[in-house]
Every structure is written in structure tokens, then in C-alpha cells.
Curated annotation (Swiss-Prot):
Catalyzes the decarboxylation of four acetate groups of uroporphyrinogen-III to yield coproporphyrinogen-III. PANTHER family: METHYLTETRAHYDROFOLATE:HOMOCYSTEINE METHYLTRANSFERASE RELATED (PTHR21091), UROPORPHYRINOGEN DECARBOXYLASE (PTHR21091:SF169). This is Uroporphyrinogen decarboxylase. Homodimer. Belongs to the uroporphyrinogen decarboxylase family. HAMAP family: URO_D (MF_00218). Keywords: Cytoplasm, Decarboxylase, Lyase, Porphyrin biosynthesis. One of its GO terms (biological process) is protoporphyrinogen IX biosynthetic process. One of its GO terms (molecular function) is uroporphyrinogen decarboxylase activity.
Amino acid sequence: MSSQLIPATRRVLNNAPLLDAAHGKTPTRTPVWFMRQAGRSLPEYLKVREGISMLDSCFMPELLAEITMQPVRRHDVDAAILFSDIVVPLRAAGVGVEIVPGRGPVMDQPVRTRADIDNLPILDHEVTEVSKGISIILDELTDTQALIGFAGAPFTLASYLVEGGPSKNHERTKAMIHAEPETWHALMERLVPTVVNFLKTQIDAGIDAMQLFDSWAGFLTERDYTEHVLPYSTRILQEVEQYQLPRIHFGVGTGELLGAMSRAGSEVMGVDWRVPLDKAAERIAAVSGPKVLQGNLDPALLFAGTEPLTREINRIKGEAAAAIAAGNATGHIFNLGHGVLPNTVAENITEAVSIIHAS
């Protein structure tokens, strides 16, 4: 991996609303991007993905670049989010994993013993297919549009590995945490360099910001999160701090964990739709001081029609403004409180972006 702190390929963006907001400056308009904005809600996505598996498409530079750019062209969002998947770094390291349609990532072999952990491959090289894809994306983005890279946090990766795939209850994961804490911590230690090196691939290729996704952290108590998860997410964010790009931290169902998660060290905290933004800001500021907020429209509102959608967007923007006025937040990036739902009508997303920018 490159040891260069600020890559030569990094763009200098002086008028990108998302980066201005992430740095606590006043943007020219409310920046917005949506988690899963590149995906099944877009007919053009379904067309280019036809006959190609999800994971394979993440390792095809021209295709991943095209998919990344589709929602930017269509919706006028203020950022592209790299088309990838949480398990891509595992696949790149040599872990046997496939994304099964209708189910999600499924491991060839679950990781449940210390021997399994010791044999778990570690990503120690650049993922060149991703680097090449980022280069193509950067050639098309304007200087007002940021490129966000991302990686899954080690807890979420560990859960997929231990459970062998998606889980409704994460019972094997929680059992390992409590019954075999040394084994659990060994697994988390093993995953940290894989996550860091996947982020460094993206940083060296020139991304403008990054998000650490902890999709399943909301299944944990605050005590378990603080003791068994937080130290590893903190280390990952510390490892990339030197590159001087905004770091976003997000998990689903993490309203009760926002204070704890904020201690990991990101500049921006993602909030899901279950917690009002001004209340979320209070929880974050009480622990870590004011941060930039990201969120938090319920994805289901994209099915509700113009009037309810406009009302909810204005409510959320009002909560963000109140949090900033109270000194509990330093900025706001508009997003959903989770990913775009697969059956969302693409035109509804475009309308939401227009309302966010106009109001």
C-alpha cells in the first residue's frame, strides 16, 4: 500500500456542498446523497447488471464506475458512493463468499473457532480493480460532486463470518462475544487490517470522503458495543485520519448507541430514521461534542407522494437547523435513515433531491 499521506490523485474541491458541510462550513445548498442510490431502483442498473453477479460486478472497473455514476447523472445528488459491497474486501483477501439473490452474503465456511480465525485470509494488497474503477469515476465527476468510499466495520463483517450469512438474531455472534471473548477479540483483530487496507485502496485512488458502515451494530447493547466493538472501529478511523478526508460513521438501529459510536472519531455521524436529528445531536454532543449530522429520512417516505415527502424533508431540515443553532451539531448532510428500498420508483428519488435542494 502507498505510504503517501495525501495522494497525488486527490482532487481539490473548493465548491463541493457535501465536503463543505462535512467540514462544518456553510454549503451553497443542502448536500444530499442516498445510501444504495446505485442499485435496483434504477432501470439502467438492472440493464447493465443483467447476467452478472453482484460480487463480480464489484470487480469490473468499467461496470462499477458506470453503476456508481448512474444515480449522479439521474438525480443530481451531491455525491457518488462507490458501488461495492461490505464483503468485497473479504472476497479480495481470498475468503470464499457469494451474494445469494434474495438472501445476501453467504460464506463458504463459517468462522467459529480459533483455528478458523488463524486461517482467515487478510487483505494486504491494493484492490486494483477498485482503484481503476475510481479513476474512471473521477474523470466524470464535476468539482461540485464528491466521491464517497466505504467499508464495512469489523463487527458487521465478523457477524457475517460467524453466522455464515445474514442473521435475524445474530445468536452465534452474541454467544461468541459472551462465551468466548478471547476468540471474539482475536477475530476482530484479524479483520482490522483488511478493512483498513480496503479503505487505503480507495483513498490512494482519490476518494473525497469515506463512510464506515456498521450495519448490524444496532443489535447490540451499549455495554457490549463499547467493550467488544468500539475499540476496533476506533482503530480503523484512526488509521485513516492521517489522510485528512471526512469520515462518516453509520449503523442501522443505533439510536441508543450514537453517543458510544461517536467516540470512534468520525467527523460525521449518520443517524437512522428512528431518532429525531435534534435528539440524536444531543446524544452525540453530550459524549463527543458537536459533530456533523447525516440523515435521516425514512426510506418508506419515497413511496408516500409529494406532500408527505415535502413535509418530512422540511421537518428533518428543521431539526438539523435547530441542532446547529443549539450548538449540538456543526452541519448537516441529507440522506436516508437506511438504504433506498429496491422497489422505490426512480422518479421519486429525483423528486426528493429536488425538494431537498429547493427548500
